[in-house]
Structures are given as C-alpha cells and as structure tokens.
Amino acid sequence: MRQFTMSQKLYMGVKRIIDILLSAMALILLSWLFLILCIAIKIDSRGPILFKQKRVGIHKTHFMIYKFRTMRLDTPKDMPTHMLADPEQYITRVGKFLRKSSLDELPQIINILMGKMSIVGPRPALWNQYDLIEERDKYGANDVMPGLTGWAQINGRDELEIDVKAKLDGEYVKKFGFIMDLKCFFGTITAVLSHKGVVEGGTGEMHK
C-alpha cells in the first residue's frame, strides 16, 4: 500500500471538500445541458439514458460508475472498448458526439458527490481490466480515489499503452497534491477542446 506524507493526507480531506462543492455547483449549472443530452439520447436510440458499469475504486473496491449511454444495447457487456473487434459499429450517432466531446462522462459528477470518485485522479479501471489494475499496483495508483480526469488523461488518454498509462498514474500519486491537481484540471480543458487522445478502440497508438 502506498505511504503518503502528512501533508498529502491532510490534502485528501481538503480535496474531498473541494470535490463536493465543485460537483454540486456543476450539477446545478449544467442541469440544462443534462436535460438536452437526456432528450437527445432517448430520441436517437432505444435503451436507458444512463449506462452503469462496475469499476475499480480506491484500494481496489468496486463501485458502479455512471455515464451517458453511447452504445447500442447489443454491445458485449463488461468489455473494454479497445478489446472490441469493431467498436464503431456499436456506437450510436449521439454517442459519437458524446464520446468525442467527453460529455458522456458528465454523470460521474454523481459518483463524485457520492464519494466514490474525485474530480482528479487515475481513471477508474473496469473490474476485469486485470492488466491495468496489476500495473497500477506497482505504483500505488490503486490507493487513491479514481477521478473524472487525471494525469494520464491529459498525456495521451486512449493512445497510451497499458504500462505507460499505469506509469503516468503512478507519477500522479508520487506528486499527489494541490499543484498536481491544478495541472490536471486545466490540462483537461485543453485536451477536451482539442479532442486530444480520443481514439475509439485505443489503448494505444502512442509509442512508449
């Protein structure tokens, strides 16, 4: 288990307060966008608006993550997108826009309010993504709260190989603190606007 300094432990408490305040504010301010996206998803394809999936949380506990549904109902369950033979065939029309813009991740604000996720942290792995979970163990990256965005997300995202992604998650844990979270937060704005690192079926196209 990763050992944290006293200042890092204190920051974890502060970070939780920041998460609650910002996620509550985001839910209120973005309620109009949630409504529009819910209507678009319902009109576009058959199925529920939200997609739930078992993911790995802090200390490798499991929780259900929330996303806007972007794929058809016949998509193989609990399978990472990069393991699908042709992921494009399962993605809905609205889903393509949501995934490219990262708006499909917005319902995770609920996960943050519930205390299962943080705004910044390693992206939560699928419960059966054993290769990524094992690699993260080497760096203590399973010992922090998973995040809506993180260091690996702004440094390659889907283009990264599993081992490279885990190393970046480990780098985040090593430098865990307010400054690192600020870098990830503002780096995310640039990454989302440029669609940087979004590759359907990735991990990954970027060379190690």
Model-identified regions with their sequence ranges:
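A hydrophobic, helix-centered structural microdomain
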Residues: R2-D74, N111, F178, K183-K208
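Hydrophobic structural segments characteristic of membrane proteins
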Residues: I110-K208
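Short, glycine-rich, amphipathic interfacial segments at transmembrane boundaries or analogous
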Residues: F51-Y90, L148-L168
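Short, structured helix-loop boundary elements
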Residues: Y11, K15, L84, E88-I91, ...
